[in-house]
Amino acid sequence: MSALRILILSNTPWDNSNSFGNSFSNIFFGIDDIEIANIYCRYGEPDNCIVKKYFQITEKSLIKNLKNSSSPSGKEVFIEADSTDLNEKEQIAFDSARKKRWQIMFWARDFVWKIGRWCSPELKAFIDDFKPDVIFQPIYY
């Protein structure tokens, strides 16, 4: 019997140092005959021994894609530090906006995701290549 392929969608990268990554690593650790891929929508680098494949989509990549359609809206991430992180200036702006929690920032983020071309050929190829049996998205509140 072939391994069960599970595709998990998340906001944050699957990192054992954050609550999502720690919880899901504990849930899936030690289960034989599964393969897991993770599509995540934030900056950062995954860090765990469970997931085999990653795909990252960020607001920044969506905005770049809206400005220039040849710029990819997402990319497959390999553990060798291939994920997109913010530079120091961008990180300060991002943290400030997150702390202030202005409603306009939520609207702007929703707008970018609404008009953004997130369903890209790269994302479709990633999903087609992985061929998931189950797609799972945790509900965050």
Task: Describe the role of every protein-language-model region.
Residues 1-79:
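N-terminal subdomain of nucleotide-sugar transferases
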Residues 138-141:
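Short His-centered aromatic/hydrophobic patch
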Residues 77-134:
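Conserved nucleotide-sugar donor-binding subdomain of glycosyltransferases
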